[in-house]
Amino acid sequence: MVLEKRGVVKPEEGVRALLEHLGEDVTRPGVVDTPKRFVKALGELTRGLREPPPEVVFFPLEYDAEPGPVVIENISAVSLCEHHLLPILLSVSVAYIPGDGVPGLSKVIRLVKWAAARPIMQERFTEWLADLLMEKLRARAVAVEVCGVHMCSFIRGVRDEHHNMVTRAKRGDIDVKLRCRRPPLCR
């Protein structure tokens, strides 16, 4: 991990110190391996910071008409709130007008999941995702809608489990109505 390369305390030791600070007995059998598991889980949740974006494969359009929008609704993804490092459960809907070829469906989904795998502020993430999709999909236009359930306000602070945040971004001339539903685990 990056922290180890910088010669800083091993991440597991930092987690162990935090657990002790919170009053946990870190020698307890159920907790003794928690620092290692926590660091591994956090690594998975932030893999987008270290891994390159997935390659996008394109297929020829094979027709002469102007392509209409392609819509992919309710892509499930998980991110972290950059302020509290608590999970954000996301449902992302994307529409794009293909440029020179159509990207593979699974590649679009993988790209969204990769983009979400990092600490984010949802408002900024939505704008960045629209730019990223325009570039990587070689699209003529893109629309994005992100519905997020933020654990930082679900389990702490206002403790409201019924809300969700919806953010939208659009690039180019695209006329679609996206329907992004609350993430599946939060319905």
UniProtKB/Swiss-Prot annotation:
Cystine residue pairs: none
Entry's family note: Belongs to the GTP cyclohydrolase I family.
PANTHER family: GTP CYCLOHYDROLASE 1, GTP CYCLOHYDROLASE I
Keywords: GTP-binding, Hydrolase, Metal-binding, Nucleotide-binding, One-carbon metabolism, Zinc
Pathway(s) annotated for this protein in UniProt: Cofactor biosynthesis; 7,8-dihydroneopterin triphosphate biosynthesis; 7,8-dihydroneopterin triphosphate from GTP: step 1/1
Gene behind this protein: folE
Protein name: GTP cyclohydrolase 1
GO cellular component terms given for this protein: cytoplasm
Catalytic reactions of this protein: GTP + H2O = 7,8-dihydroneopterin 3'-triphosphate + formate + H(+)
Subunit field text: Homomer.
GO biological process: one-carbon metabolic process; tetrahydrobiopterin biosynthetic process; tetrahydrofolate biosynthetic process
Enzyme Commission number, as recorded: 3.5.4.16
